C-alpha cells in the first residue's frame, strides 16, 4: 500500500472512494491491518477500556498513548497514523501543543481532539505549526459525564443546527478531518456534504466519507458482552483475523457496511 497522507484522504473524498479506519495499539495488528488494506490506524484512548480494563477512556495519559503510537509505527506499512489527545491533555493551548508534539514525535501523522467549535483556537494553533488535526464531534467519550452517558447526539433540531455550524467552523479553523460518532445518519450526510475535508463515521450512517470501528469490537471481543448498535462482528465466517479485517475493508468500500440497522435516526 502506498503511503497514505492527508492529501491522499482528501483525494479519496473527492473521488468518492470510501476511507477505512480501525483502532490499533501494537505492531502486529498494525502490520495485519495494513496487509488488509486499512488506510488509517487510530491509536484511540479506547485503549483504556479494551486494553487496560477501565470503564471509560478518562484514565488514559499522553505517555501511554505515545507508547502505543510508537508500537504501531514499528508495524505500520503505509497507513496514516492518527492519535487521540487524551482527556484534559488539551486543557490549555500550551498543553495542547506540548502533548500533540509528544504524540507526533512518537510517530503519529495526525492528532484527534474531541469537542466542538470551542476547539477552533487549538486546531488553528496546531495546524499553523504543521500538525494535522482531526476534530471528533457528536458523542465524545471524554465528555461522557457531561453528556449523561453514551447517547446519540444531534437528534434535536437545535443540536443538529449547532453541529453543522461547528463542523464548518472547525474546517475553517484548519481541521484536516472530522470524525462523527453516534449522530443521526441524515445529519452526518448533511455535514459530510457541507465540508470539503473527509468525514469519518462511527454510528453515523453510510453517507460519510469513511468508517471507523474499534478493532476489538469488530473482531467480536468484549469484556462486558455489550455490543454497540453500530458494530458488526466481521470474524463470523472468516478463517483468521486478517480475513476479518479484509471483509471489513471490502464492506466499507462497497457500502454494504454500515447497513441501516447500524445507524440512528433523528
Swiss-Prot record:
Task performed by this protein: Catalyzes the reversible reaction in which hydroxymethyl group from 5,10-methylenetetrahydrofolate is transferred onto alpha-ketoisovalerate to form ketopantoate.
Enzyme class at the top of the EC tree: transferase
GO molecular function: 3-methyl-2-oxobutanoate hydroxymethyltransferase activity; magnesium ion binding
GO biological process, one term: pantothenate biosynthetic process
Signal peptide (from-to): none
Record keywords: Cytoplasm, Magnesium, Metal-binding, Pantothenate biosynthesis, Transferase
Name of the protein this chain belongs to: 3-methyl-2-oxobutanoate hydroxymethyltransferase
SUPFAM superfamilies given in the database record: Phosphoenolpyruvate/pyruvate domain (SSF51621)
Protein's organism: Pseudomonas syringae pv. tomato (strain ATCC BAA-871 / DC3000)
